[in-house]
Regions:
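Cell-envelope/ECM-targeting effectors and their regulatory/trafficking segments
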Residues: 1-143
Length: 143
């Protein structure tokens, strides 16, 4: 059901601190990492074994300002130094898109399409696609 305003203060220390606020930060990433590790057990395309650290390493700095919905835990580095993230690689494998470990328009569009959202390739702050993603992560609904 719907939670009342202010409830995040009460639930922040619970097992699942994720709220559907439309911003993809560390809490969203930890839930994604848990899910990808679970999927890896049944889907050989996904490698799993991800640390539950809430970090998305070595991402293209040029994507940061274009995607204000991506917040805590995202490491933005100069584009020529960006080597990508294992978490994003597994997300890309799961979505069936090109695997380079880097968030960008093609990966975002694939995620948006899977979520039934407009595939515009950007994640606003807040983002309707991130809200839908967070709801799937909270509910454990990945069909």
């Amino acid at each position: 059901g719907m939670l009342a305003f202010g409830s995040t203060l009460v639930t922040a220390t619970s097992a699942n601190a994720l709220t559907d606020d439309g911003y993809w930060g560390s809490e969203t990433t930890v839930e994604l990492q848990k899910r990808l590790n679970s999927i890896a057990a049944v889907n050989s395309a996904v490698e799993g074994g991800l640390p539950l650290d809430g970090q998305i390493d070595s991402q293209l700095a040029s994507q940061s300002s274009a995607n204000p919905g991506l917040t805590s835990g995202w490491q933005w580095v100069s584009d020529d130094a960006a080597s990508g993230s294992d978490t994003i690689k597994d997300l890309q494998r799961w979505l069936g898109t090109d695997v380079d470990g880097l968030i960008g328009p093609s990966t975002i569009s694939a995620l948006q399409s899977w979520l039934g959202q407009t595939a515009d390739g950007v994640l606003d702050g807040p983002s309707p696609a991130i809200v839908a993603f967070q709801r799937k992560l909270i509910e454990g609904n990945y069909s």
